[in-house]
């Protein structure tokens, strides 16, 4: 299944990556285009005949937004569905009171969650990136992996349908614009895939966005790979623009992807070269990943200095963004 993503040595991967970067689309017949143009013209003519020359197409629906930021305060949402994805991961769906409203979450941003444990003096706050589409009305989804001694993830996994959770936001991260970069690389570990998936989905659902995307995603076991089907579907649909490389610390015998931790040899092989113009590298994952790859952030508003593997490979601070 992962034959195209196997990390055997640097040279085969580099050849695959070069082909992905330079292969031209195959020529196609123009007949379907002419047919489509003709049918479009006919449709416009019939529309004007029945509704008049001054008629215009219906404007897109402007939906209310659940989260507006600023001084809005906390919004309580009811848990409506629970889907078990693996031994330690669930997809939780929280519904909006207004079933026609959208979340108001932007690319790339997150929501702050809050709950107060019984007997505790302070509430627990944690940011989460929704995995549902930003244009989806009626609800939002969180993919949550439970961590030992992680108070918020343990609370979320203990929740039952019809219970409520407090949200606030959105919390803006990186302001994405169509074709802002020619090529982006995403380096993720564990649940760090969620903001990456948010960005990937936005790029490929926009027909005007031609950005190339390379994903390097590390996990402990195969069951830990979050959003696996969604990522594979996108890679199969856009093979010339999206490549994903998976690594497992504890792979099964039949695993054909990368083994071990995200390392310098792999990144040197699959990432765009530092000298390439108009590129950006995004990093998100546990502290150990940041330490090894890019260095940690100082604060949510301070990216800190670039260090680790990316600095060793010759990238500069402006080429890297740490979620």
From Swiss-Prot:
The lineage of its organism: Eukaryota, Fungi, Dikarya, Ascomycota, Pezizomycotina. It is a single-pass membrane protein. Pfam families: FAD_binding_6, NAD_binding_1. It catalyses: 2 Fe(III)-[cytochrome b5] + NADH = 2 Fe(II)-[cytochrome b5] + NAD(+) + H(+). GO terms for cellular component: mitochondrial outer membrane. The keyword Chaperone does not apply. Gene3D superfamilies: Nucleotide-binding domain of ferredoxin-NADP reductase (FNR) module, Translation factors. It comes from Aspergillus oryzae (strain ATCC 42149 / RIB 40). Belongs to the flavoprotein pyridine nucleotide cytochrome reductase family. May mediate the reduction of outer membrane cytochrome b5. One of its GO terms (molecular function) is cytochrome-b5 reductase activity, acting on NAD(P)H. One of its GO terms (biological process) is ergosterol biosynthetic process. This is NADH-cytochrome b5 reductase 2. The chain crosses the membrane at residues 30-46. Residues 72-177 form the FAD-binding FR-type domain. The keyword ATP-binding does not apply.
């Amino acid at each position: 299944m992962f034959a195209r993503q196997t990390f055997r040595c640097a040279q085969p991967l580099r050849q695959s990556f070069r082909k992905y970067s330079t292969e031209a689309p195959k020529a196609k017949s123009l007949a379907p285009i002419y047919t489509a143009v003709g049918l479009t013209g006919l449709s416009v003519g019939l529309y004007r005949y029945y509704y008049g020359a001054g008629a215009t197409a219906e404007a897109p629906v402007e939906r209310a937004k659940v989260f507006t930021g600023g001084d809005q305060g906390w919004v309580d949402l009811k848990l409506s569905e629970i889907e078990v994805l693996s031994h330690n991961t669930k997809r939780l769906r929280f519904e909006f009171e207004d079933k026609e409203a959208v979340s108001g979450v932007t690319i790339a941003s997150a929501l702050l969650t809050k709950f107060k444990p019984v007997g505790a003096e302070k509430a627990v706050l944690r940011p989460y990136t929704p995995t549902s589409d930003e244009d989806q009305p009626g609800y939002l989804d969180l993919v949550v992996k439970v961590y030992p001694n992680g108070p918020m993830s343990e609370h979320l996994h203990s929740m039952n349908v019809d219970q409520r959770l407090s949200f606030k936001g959105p919390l803006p991260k990186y302001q994405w614009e169509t074709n802002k970069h020619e090529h982006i690389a995403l380096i993720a570990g564990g649940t760090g895939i969620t903001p990456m998936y948010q960005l990937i989905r936005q790029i490929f659902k926009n027909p005007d966005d031609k950005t190339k995307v390379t994903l390097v995603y590390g996990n402990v076991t195969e069951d830990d790979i979050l959003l696996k089907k969604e990522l594979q579907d996108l890679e199969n649909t856009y093979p010339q623009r999206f490549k994903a490389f998976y690594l497992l610390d504890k792979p099964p015998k039949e695993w054909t992807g990368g083994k071990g931790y995200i390392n310098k040899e792999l990144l040197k092989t699959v990432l765009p070269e530092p000298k390439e113009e108009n590129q950006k590298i995004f990093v998100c994952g546990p502290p150990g990943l940041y330490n090894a790859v890019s260095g940690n952030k100082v604060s949510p508003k301070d990216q800190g200095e670039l260090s680790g593997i990316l600095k060793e490979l010759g990238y500069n601070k402006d080429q890297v963004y740490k979620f």
